[in-house]
Amino acid sequence: MPTTFQEIPRERPVTPLLDRADTPAGLRRLAEADLETLADELRQELLYTVGQTGGHFGAGLGVIELTIALHYVFDTPDDRLVWDVGHQAYPHKILTGRRNRMLSLRQKDGIAAFPRRSESEYDTFGVGHSSTSISAALGMAIAARLQNSARKSIAVIGDGALTAGMAFEALNHAQEVNADMLVILNDNDMSISRNVGGLSNYLAKILSSRTYASMREGSKKVLSRLPGAWEIARRTEEYAKGMLVPGTLFEELGWNYIGPIDGHDLPTMIATLRNMRDLKGPQFLHVVTKKGKGFAPAEVDPIGYHAITKLEPADKPAAPKKVSGPKYSAVFGQWLCDMAAADNRLVGITPAMKEGSDLVDFSERYPQRYFDVAIAEQHAVTLAAGMACEGSKPVVAIYSTFLQRAYDQLIHDVAVQNLDVLFAIDRAGLVGEDGPTHAGSYDLSYLRCIPGMLVMTPSDENELRKMLSTGHLYNGPAAVRYPRGTGPNAPISGDLQPLEIGKGVVRRQGEKIALLVFGVQLAEAMQVAEQINATVVDMRFVKPLDEALVLELAGSHELLVTIEENAIMGGAGAAVGEFLASQAVLKPLLHLGLPDIYVEHAKPAQMLAECGLDAAGIEASVKARMAKLGL
């Protein structure tokens, strides 16, 4: 069984077996008896790597043995291995030729946080969002069948990701087409079953064996001529399996369910995977693992160790504390509790983001009004719509990148019916090391085209609080988008008063140049304005746009510059340009925002600089346009 470590090593561990097995070909040359020692070495290597770089932590520790077993038994990359989400894929990356690059993990121009097709042939499908693996692996299995290929397709999905409807849609379709594929449920929360042990492991070996499969198919052919006898045999088998395993649901969906087995028992996993490798039809293996396995603190606190920051050198002097405000998510969490105390109609809804969206306090103070729907964004939005129909005032706390998954529900179920649903959209804009799959780059573009939608962009913590109150009191759907991280430490008012809808605020009066800011780049715009004597406007509202103010600025300035941390195409700046065009106003415009590319992972400051959204970039772009216009 795995060794349990107490500390994260600061020096690279000695790993003689891993040195020979950092590719699947090298791994398969090892004796099976050496694999448990290899697992200990791989676990130490992962601890060291993430300690140096920061990143997702607990999930990878929990799949060390599973990752080794998969690459040992299957002929990757010819056999297609698809990881769901990708939080757990660091061991996979180490074992597939990227060990020497792992210290660049999540850094600019380095290894990505998630599997990427462009990074390695072993990353067969790019991921980041949850619940896509079964659909992708099914598509690969069907393609293999059409190409007369014998390659295997394997999806590894967690118990959390299996709560999403998309996963069950794929499970249902796979049995319809009788796909030859394997789905592995990595149950690291024991939320489906606690029935793991010697008897369950033994049963899994029997049920997955070729002998059992051959006997089962042979009996089916014989007994199918005697319908009564076959029905009795089928029910007897189901009863036997149902007594020992929680696979009834998957069996009813047409899958051959095996498990649960201990995901840290390498011999059992290897034997079971070998048995299942050549079975025909949809196969489902339930593996129970422990998140954070092998690192004692993470086993005790898997949520706290979901991800960690990098270790600082032991002898490094403490850096002076940077003065910054509270996290935007914390401001939202406090507002939610305050408004809930003032309005008993308020309910809070989140798709599995209680900690990330800062809903812990609300969930404890108002448990009857808190709803975590798991990874089910579509359901979350329509649930809110149903509540709003009956007079509740739902607040959906959701990351920008995940709201994309519920766009139809946002339009069809909320907006068309003009329901009072407030969307608190966290992680808007660039999010840093998680890269383009998690960036909130598009919400302004896809929200502002929806009729009746109120769309707001706070420039600081106090503006966020006021906009949340504005959205809560608005008659219709409303959205407030705010970034990851901390604010500029603006004084926060304790009241719950709303803003006047559709009105921006001039923060600095200048001449010739007007900087129209939608969001948190206000501080950078103020710095630039001091250098070029520009007017600075906190636009506040993307929809409805402060059209009167835009016309006034166009009439009194020679260049309008829009600034937003959203895709330029279709964003807030585009709204300004469209409005001026509709009024037949010809005015030089410069739109600064996210370019028409996927901005790769790096530190947030590096990403903003790359996009020209830091103070230096804004100043350079504005001065270049001024020179072109002769200003």
Swiss-Prot record:
GO terms for biological process: 1-deoxy-D-xylulose 5-phosphate biosynthetic process; isopentenyl diphosphate biosynthetic process, methylerythritol 4-phosphate pathway; terpenoid biosynthetic process; thiamine biosynthetic process. InterPro entries: Dxylulose-5-P_synthase, THDP-binding, Transketo_C/PFOR_II, Transketolase-like_Pyr-bd, Transketolase_BS, Transketolase_C. Thiamine diphosphate binds at residues 87, 128-130, 160-161, 188, 295, 377. Mg(2+) binds at residues 159, 188. Its EC number is 2.2.1.7. GO terms for cellular component: cytosol. It catalyses: D-glyceraldehyde 3-phosphate + pyruvate + H(+) = 1-deoxy-D-xylulose 5-phosphate + CO2. GO terms for molecular function: 1-deoxy-D-xylulose-5-phosphate synthase activity; magnesium ion binding; thiamine pyrophosphate binding. Its cofactor is Mg(2+); thiamine diphosphate. Pathway: Metabolic intermediate biosynthesis; 1-deoxy-D-xylulose 5-phosphate biosynthesis; 1-deoxy-D-xylulose 5-phosphate from D-glyceraldehyde 3-phosphate and pyruvate: step 1/1. Binds 1 Mg(2+) ion per subunit. Binds 1 thiamine pyrophosphate per subunit. PROSITE patterns: TRANSKETOLASE_2. It comes from the Bacteria. Pfam families: DXP_synthase_N, Transket_pyr, Transketolase_C. Keywords: Isoprene biosynthesis, Magnesium, Metal-binding, Thiamine biosynthesis, Thiamine pyrophosphate, Transferase. Homodimer. Belongs to the transketolase family. DXPS subfamily. Catalyzes the acyloin condensation reaction between C atoms 2 and 3 of pyruvate and glyceraldehyde 3-phosphate to yield 1-deoxy-D-xylulose-5-phosphate (DXP). This is 1-deoxy-D-xylulose-5-phosphate synthase.
